[in-house]
Amino acid sequence: PIPVLLTGSMRPAGATGSDAWDNLVGALRVLQEGHARGVQVYFNDALLHGARVSKLRSDAFDAFAELPRPRHAEHAPVPAALGYRQPRREVNLAVLPLYPGLRAAHLRGLLDSGVEALLLECYGSGTGPSDDEELLALLREAHARGVLLAAVSQCAYGQVEFGVYAAGSRLRDAGLLSAGGMTREAALGKLFGLLGAGLGRDEAQRWFALDLCGENAD
């Protein structure tokens, strides 16, 4: 596949002390020399894995970094159905961070909007307000009607392991799928890619749990 290399700048190209030209020239040099296929990000003299990078700062040139999250998923080659030449359809997705005080009515409003998948940002290793029976019931109902429910960790260096605490196990039993050590950006992009390719919920869940391009395996 043709490599995709993304770059940009923290200051406009015409501003004094801009990093735009250094990033652009550096990115072109990387392309000229050749690098691993796939999506990469070049910023501040660093070549970063596109499926692992996050923006951590808004006030410095080293704004992007790869987070060393635990990634232990089984790797699988990208199937033809998910190839970059395949057309994609629009997908209705949502992201919701869990927080103390989250009400079931908030979740109901989101699910009633017709989302096909919901990415929940859970506490730590994959816990949340699991003592809220109404909220859990809403998740179970959404899962039963075909909504793909996935969970990432809110921690910058975390991963979702539902079996560590009872609270996490209850979320898993309500239908949530662990994103393992994927970042929010990677998990969201993966959901867009899987569902946008026309895969059904069950098939999308199967591929979501596998590592396809280094997003969830070292």
Predicted feature residues:
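Active-site histidine-anchored catalytic micro-motif
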Residues: P1-R103, R108-E121, S125-D218
